[in-house]
Amino acid sequence: MKLSRRSFMKANAVAAAAAAAGLSVPGVARAVVGQQEAIKWDKAPCRFCGTGCGVLVGTQQGRVVACQGDPDAPVNRGLNCIKGYFLPKIMYGKDRLTQPMLRMKDGSYHKDGEFTPVSWEQAFDVMEEKFKTSLKEKGPEAIGMFGSGQWTIWEGYAAAKLFKAGFRSNNIDPNARHCMASAVVGFMRTFGMDEPMGCYDDIEQADAFVLWGSNMAEMHPILWSRITNRRLSDPNVKVAVLSTFQHRSFELADNGIVFTPQSDLVILNYIANYIIQNNAVNQDFFTKHVNLRKGATDIGYGLRPTHPLEKAAKNPGSDASEPMSFDEYKAFVAEYTLDKTAEMSGVPKDQLEQLAQLYADPNKRVISYWTMGFNQHTRGVWANNLVYNLHLLTGKISQPGCGPFSLTGQPSACGTAREVGTFSHRLPADMVVTNEKHRDICEKHWQIPAGTIPAKVGLHAVAQDRALKDGKLNVYWVMCNNNMQAGPNINEDRMPGWRDPRNFIIVSDPYPTVSALSADLILPTAMWVEKEGAYGNAERRTQFWRQQIKAPGEAKSDLWQLVQFSRRFKTEEVWPEALLAQKPELRGKTLYDVLFATPAVSKFPLSELKEDQLNDESRELGFYLQKGLFEEYAWFGRGHGHDLAPFDDYHNARGLRWPVVEGKETQWRYSEGNDPYVEAGEGYKFYGKPDGKAVIFALPFEPAAESPDNEYDLWLSTGRVLEHWHTGSMTRRVPELHHAFPEAVVFIHPLDAKARDLRRGDKVKVSSRRGEVISIVETRGRNRPPQGLVYMPFFDTAQLVNNLTLDATDPLSKETDFKKCAVKLAKV
């Protein structure tokens, strides 16, 4: 085999990434260069995290056989992380589902029956009966859907349209509720628009990086490689890492800070105080572009109303705020002194001062990065608001090399869950169901009767669990996620609700996950390049890919499932007479006719596809479905700062960052010369707000919902590891990744282990007030908790860590706090 220099470098990149994780490289990855004539290559975004790396997918004889980093992709520039190099193997687990499976007994559906193969016709027959019965007897609030930040853009759009316009139910929510909802509400409160204003190009221009509750070395390794390159290429560049335990990102840190859980709120207010006390406020920017408001406090913890913490809260769930003066804000943060902050956080004073100095130095361009440490937090929205405060006080925002940046964990948590509006309270392009004008815009564009979309916010993720247990939500369709394993407090509401005979649960998934095996009907799903798709990453980059192979057996894409199921319902079966009277021409039509086969959606012919191009859904329907749905959806954002490019542009590019105006993408929003919506002379304009000004919020420290006590004496924090993604339903089916980290462990401080007579490798029972798991003690390795805290990853189906977690949420975002609950350990 003869290797070119470029091919040699690619092969070495694979080997280097594998070696860094202690893994062997599959032969197919080593040999890809020599097989280029035999393998067909096409581009796609990676299937895993929200970084949005570009990969080249190699297919041969109807299978994905190879994958390499796309050297033309601006995000990763040809490099993959270890999960990315093993992408081909995620699709070929031995237990891949290839036909629908229904619980049956004596030849028919039974809640306690055994999973039995059925046809799609039989599966849809049962689903249709369950949906129609619930709609007739209880109405739209009795049905619901739990979707995903892994849906393609048109899958999420089709799901939202089917439920909100078709079934007239806002009970649709994505698993992004568990990871990005606090970021969404934080952006909306401060800026009036969602998603970061900066981009990854900031990395090469920044002078300092501050990680707030983000282990980028393992969770966003490609971005971390760029930060590492920037840090090592300039001795003046600084990195600060804040976490409740030490992890791999600390290895690069100039200032590694371990703080007491929940005290990040204190540290953030201290830095604001430091900026003011040291005259580091950018007065010109602040005066022209910022308002000040004091937020409501004592807002509860998103628990059931009967919980003592909710009863005790003075303003449960309040998003209220009132204007305040700068002097009032100055007095508010003045309480967060260095002494008080050091005492509450456990962080040495010199480290706190070093951190504050990064933000206060007018000559340092600072990027703040965060992920789940901020967002999965009972005051996650506040944490987001408070970090924005630091950038707004100093004017370090919306310019190259500086700004706040919320990183995402799923490939299209931004592009689908957030931008499309698959949350229970949202509509496309930052619109919301509670706004009559927004509903009217959607109804007119979709050409459905006025009043079709309900004004009431639907059930969010945790509320869905509670409604299932309470018998109020009776038909529940789960797509593209494994929430039985990933969601909080499994045994309290979710498992009882799923197995309640009153309820019918459908799970669409490629594999028999914990969720699938807990359901009543499993629908086999096409994966990744087995369908045409689009994702939107963390830097507002929308990326397309084409279908490159067919799905195995009878597996079908989520889009196919949604669109085909809509054929089962006529308008008079789901809409009241008052609505039909407005548009009598819709009588007798199916939801497919009204939502998906409309002139707007079906106007793009199959001739726009190349003759040999795979596209199973479109070829079955007779029109280019994906293009029709995308163009209909993109209309919502064009003209007011959410502009997406024409459909075809994305197939010809390595992604484009919105707003895309006159063919040009936007790297930095809200600043003159960078954002087409900021006019000459305005300098900055935060145009999501009516007056064009961003908001600094005064928000205090409030304690966690649950803290260690005499009985449950340790904090538990949960999360991920490099080798596995979320619940491991894909990565654990890759032998190399599974063998690299085969089972979950409890990372614990050696002194905490010694005090409990535990040694490395011992079996240990981890218990909370909600449940228990048996795990293995780990006193060494990549994660090094302080005394008083343990860390556990949640990928292991044999150790359902969410048996332990509390379903407390941020009352504003409804996002769960997976980082803080109390546990105890006992040797087994």
Swiss-Prot record:
Source species of the chain: Salmonella gallinarum (strain 287/91 / NCTC 13346)
InterPro entries: Asp_de-COase-like_dom_sf, CT_Nitrate-R-NapA-like, MoPterin_dinucl-bd_dom, Mopterin_OxRdtase, Mopterin_OxRdtase_4Fe-4S_dom, MopterinOxRdtase_cofactor_BS, Periplasm_NO3_reductase_lsu, Prok_molybdopt-oxidoreductase
Similarity comment: family membership: Belongs to the prokaryotic molybdopterin-containing oxidoreductase family. NasA/NapA/NarB subfamily.
Name used for this protein in its record: Periplasmic nitrate reductase
Cofactor annotation remark: Binds 1 [4Fe-4S] cluster. Binds 1 molybdenum-bis(molybdopterin guanine dinucleotide) (Mo-bis-MGD) cofactor per subunit.
Maturation and modification: Predicted to be exported by the Tat system. The position of the signal peptide cleavage has not been experimentally proven.
Main function: Catalytic subunit of the periplasmic nitrate reductase complex NapAB. Receives electrons from NapB and catalyzes the reduction of nitrate to nitrite.
Binding site for Mo-bis(molybdopterin guanine dinucleotide): 83, 150, 175, 179, 212-219, 243-247, 262-264, 372, 376, 482, 508-509, 531, 558, 718-727, 802, 819
UniProt lineage: Bacteria, Pseudomonadati, Pseudomonadota, Gammaproteobacteria, Enterobacterales
This protein's encoding gene: napA
Keywords on record: 4Fe-4S, Electron transport, Iron, Iron-sulfur, Metal-binding, Molybdenum, Nitrate assimilation, Oxidoreductase, Periplasm, Signal, Transport
MF GO annotations: 4 iron, 4 sulfur cluster binding; electron transfer activity; iron ion binding; molybdenum ion binding; molybdopterin cofactor binding; nitrate reductase (cytochrome) activity
